[in-house]
Amino acid sequence: MRKVGITLSVVALVIMGFVAGCIGGTQTQGEKVKVAVLFDVGGRGDLSFNDMAYLGAERAKKELGVEVEYMTPKSREDMVPLLKQLAESKEYDLLVLIGFLWTTPLDQVADQYPDQKFALIDSTTGKVRENEVDILFREQEAAALIGVIASGMAYELGGDTIGAVAGMDIPPLWKFHIGYLYGAKYFEKKTGKPVKLLWQYTGTFTDTQVGYTTGMQLLQQGAKVLYGLAGLTHVGMFDAVIDWNKQGKGKALAIGQDASQEWYAPEYIPISGAKRVDVAVYTAIEMVVKNQWKGGIMTLGLKEGGVGYWNLDGVRQFAEFAQEGGKLKDMTPEDVVRIVKEQREKYIKPEVWEIVRELEEKIKNGEIKFKTPQSHDEYEQIIKELEKGNLDAALEKE
């Protein structure tokens, strides 16, 4: 994979709480590492999380010379049997598990196969094992920036309401919710302009029709900007925004997430949040290839380049991927970049970018550190306080 542009500096990784010992011996020189990447039940084609994982693994194939196989369970009930089957085969040096839904299956299986290496992306079992690496993201940090941007866009569209179409009610989405609302309230504090947030869980990452219906409902409730946080489901949300505009019901815009999704409809999707699942997958594979495997937990945030928002280089890169895959219709990658640039200039004003840069710097230098809720009750309490304008409720205490 060619280098992808992101608004952040060079990607670095912060490794936290790692176990000192390595497992599984050393890789024999010349022996090809074999990896299985296990998507969640949504599989490829979500234009987001799973597709980003695929790009990271493909980069590893190209740059590290590994062999990669891709698998998607038919249902959640298939996850444990699939893990056991692959571990018992002793065929794979590493099993990379994509997404929160793999958490419980991995926890049930990992101790039974101590010589099998596992990498869990975007979740943690809460256990520190020598054969398990968990890679997490500080989603609040990117979502806070998106919250500022969405709020500014809403006002340019003549409204004060932003929305989000989310997938399942799970910890990674709690963090997105906290960050997005924090950003909206930060914008409110800096500008004096009130912002209302409509947040809706759909319960699915795979149903575009649900995404469409939910998106339409939020637009009918007055949302001017919708943030997609539901994988394939929020592609339906994109379609709702497109139809809303084309049917003359009003002007609205959408924001993508994980991969750069502007190419899908650049006139209506001027920006996407970045969650570098590709970096996480590549890093896990690289640890095996370079005999640097250590069990534990990694976290990636703004400072490490693991989250953020896509710049125009990234927009171009993913438009090229879409073109190569036959998904980019009636335009070129250059057209996508040109339209996105025009839409950003029109709807994201310089004063909004100033607020974004200020908030980004505070996060990167540690002045702002978000809490990670440890329970649903804590998550709900943080949201309630943020809705009151209490920004400190979302932050770690000194």
Curated annotation (Swiss-Prot):
Residues spanning the signal sequence: 1-21
SUPFAM superfamilies named among the record's database cross-references: Periplasmic binding protein-like I
UniProt KW keywords: Acetylation, Cell membrane, Lipoprotein, Membrane, Signal
N-acetylcysteine carried by residues: C22
Lipidation, S-archaeol cysteine type: C22
Chief subcellular location: membrane
Example of a GO cellular component annotation carried by this entry: plasma membrane
Top-level taxonomic group: Archaea
Gene3D superfamilies: 3.40.50.2300
Protein name: Uncharacterized lipoprotein PF1695
Species for this entry: Pyrococcus furiosus (strain ATCC 43587 / DSM 3638 / JCM 8422 / Vc1)
Taxonomic path: Archaea, Methanobacteriati, Methanobacteriota, Thermococci, Thermococcales
